[in-house]
Amino acid sequence: MGQLVHITDESFEQETRGEMPVLVDFWAEWCGPCRMVAPVLEQIATEQVGKLRIVKLNVDENQHTPMHFGVSGIQTMILFKDGQAVERIVGFMPKPQLMKRLQPHLSAATPTPTA
């Protein structure tokens, strides 16, 4: 089962490296849209195990990373692949629209069968 992992400025680089896409949810306790998207992200994390990791970074407790990536407002999500930002999503988005934005990046993450 997929699970949302909470990361920090210190663990950010390690958590977003690698071939598997990583969606970083930049959030805060007081952010209404962040609370609205949380159950959607939990569903996606469960459904996309092995294709996508979803992590959460609290912008009130970790200010360096959002500043580095120009996150000026939340709710913001950035999709990383091989440590590089490949997609930025700002504002609440229902699951079908969110998956439409993520899907092109997930197909490349499908594991290759071994003989």
Residue ranges and their predicted role:
Residues 26-40:
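Conserved redox-active cysteine motifs that mediate thiol-disulfide chemistry
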